[in-house]
């Protein structure tokens, strides 16, 4: 049997309400044509993000009741540290309120360390593909974010197993161009969100790590979707088909020195993050000094004890192979149905979302008028479905020139929350696209009425171009 049903029983439900077209038009106008600013009650199916939007298990809810809310030395912190060491193999753990909390205490410490060694006169971070908040933290600290993902990622119509891989030649060229002394860190993003939730192979992770070690550059693994990446390795990479996901995860983290993690994704919690170190106690201690004023005391990092307990449990649940098979299958189900309906997507589908290629679907709208965001708005008006643009709007402007950064792709991300929606919901999404497809030529681009200078896509306000 190819179909994989939900590997869980539903114990509690939350009612959702379908709005009228007139209600949606009014809500979108009041939100400045930015679905980020819509109230959730105005949304029928919410595919904005998989971050913190999943459903926790009965075991996680039981863990919530075991929260130790001591300011210092919570037992839940020690349980979390033990789980990180057991499952990932890293010795030192700092909890944070979410992934960007880890970035805001780690990145400036890495830059300061590099400068203390006589480098980082023109600091850069290199990644397969920085996500938006990661790039923002790099740039806010005066460094430059450089992406060197494989060019195969930009051909959305052609199948390739590893569209999250680094372009190894481009990585070496970039290090040589900027000088190893200026490369603060290499960030390996698993899976690679901005290229379509696409996996990176273990062979590529290993090659990147070996290059980094040759130049004495630390490797940070951006770990939001590490379980999904491990599942793809098990399914696609030769020699790993008989390895367990847990074994693959352990090997993945051998090719990094530290990690940042938004635990709101694969570890299945609503809030939380991690900043962990394999064996560098000195760096761990330096970062902890930033944790106290920025996130909170080092044994809670902005989290309640109950949330750390749910996270410790979720780290293991996220590696469950029955769950991962269902999870990846549901994403593929939506993607395959959209392709059958003639909707172009990033192919093959990735781990957490289906990415519609708005550049192909709306060729009449140029990148600077945000075709994927325009499609996002139309999908909401059509069916009450909220999704998110991954393209020119998200990429933003060059901080030095103020000009729009050229985006290689204009994608609409249909992000599926974990253990929340059934395939009936996915069928509804497909039907909305089929209905919407008929009026694609009439969709107009957008322009700003308010544009923030940093991470503009979150709170920008726009209007349709007449």
Curated annotation (Swiss-Prot):
GO terms for molecular function: tryptophanase activity. SUPFAM superfamilies: PLP-dependent transferases (SSF53383). Its cofactor is pyridoxal 5'-phosphate. Pfam families: Beta_elim_lyase. Gene3D superfamilies: Aspartate Aminotransferase, domain 1 (3.90.1150.10), Type I PLP-dependent aspartate aminotransferase-like (Major domain) (3.40.640.10). Its EC number is 4.1.99.1. The keyword Lyase applies. The modification N6-(pyridoxal phosphate)lysine is found at residue 265. It catalyses: L-tryptophan + H2O = indole + pyruvate + NH4(+). Homotetramer. This is Tryptophanase. It comes from Photorhabdus laumondii subsp. laumondii (strain DSM 15139 / CIP 105565 / TT01) (Photorhabdus luminescens subsp. laumondii).
């Amino acid at each position: 049997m190819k179909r994989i049903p939900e590997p869980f029983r539903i114990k509690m439900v939350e009612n959702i309400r379908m709005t009228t077209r007139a209600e949606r038009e009014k809500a979108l106008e009041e939100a400045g044509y930015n679905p980020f600013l819509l109230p959730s009650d105005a949304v029928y199916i919410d595919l904005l993000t998989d971050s913190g939007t999943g459903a926790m298990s009965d075991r996680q809810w039981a863990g919530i009741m075991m929260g130790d809310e001591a300011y210092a030395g919570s037992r839940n912190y020690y349980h979390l540290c033990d789980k990180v060491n057991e499952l990932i193999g890293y010795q030192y753990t700092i909890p944070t309120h979410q992934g960007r909390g880890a970035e805001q205490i780690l990145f400036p410490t890495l830059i300061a360390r590099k400068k203390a060694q006589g480098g980082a006169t023109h600091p850069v971070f290199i990644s397969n593909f920085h996500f938006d908040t990661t790039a923002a933290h790099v740039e806010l600290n005066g460094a430059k974010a450089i992406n060197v993902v494989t060019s195969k990622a930009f051909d959305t119509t052609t199948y390739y197993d590893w569209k999250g891989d680094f372009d190894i030649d481009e990585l070496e060229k970039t290090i040589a161009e900027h000088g190893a002394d200026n490369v603060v860190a290499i960030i390996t993003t698993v899976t690679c969100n901005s290229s379509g939730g696409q996996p990176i192979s273990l062979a590529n992770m290993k090659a990147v790590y070996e290059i980094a070690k040759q130049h004495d550059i630390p490797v940070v693994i951006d770990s939001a979707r590490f379980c999904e990446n491990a599942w793809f390795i098990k399914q696609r990479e030769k020699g790993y088909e008989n390895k367990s996901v847990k074994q693959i995860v352990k090997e993945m983290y051998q090719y990094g020195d530290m990690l940042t993690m938004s635990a709101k994704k694969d570890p299945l919690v609503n809030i939380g993050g991690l900043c962990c170190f394999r064996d560098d106690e000195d760096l761990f201690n330096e970062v902890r000094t930033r944790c106290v004023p920025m996130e909170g005391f080092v044994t809670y990092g902005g989290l309640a004890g109950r949330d750390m307990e749910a996270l410790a449990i979720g780290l293991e649940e996220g590696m469950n192979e029955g769950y991962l098979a269902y999870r990846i299958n549901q994403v593929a189900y939506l993607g395959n149905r959209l392709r059958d309906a003639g909707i172009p997507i990033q192919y093959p589908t990735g781990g957490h979302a289906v990415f519609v290629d708005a550049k192909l679907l709306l060729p009449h709208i140029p990148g600077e008028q945000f075709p994927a965001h325009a499609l996002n708005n139309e999908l909401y008006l059509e069916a009450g479905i909220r999704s998110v643009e991954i393209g020119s709007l998200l990429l933003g402007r060059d901080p030095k020139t103020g000009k729009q950064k050229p985006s290689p792709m204009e994608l609409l991300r249909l992000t599926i929350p974990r253990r929340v929606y059934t395939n009936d919901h996915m069928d509804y999404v497909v039907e909305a696209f089929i209905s919407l497809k008929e009026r694609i030529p009439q969709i107009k681009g957008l322009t700003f009425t308010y544009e923030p200078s940093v991470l503009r896509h979150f709170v920008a306000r726009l209007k349709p171009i007449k």
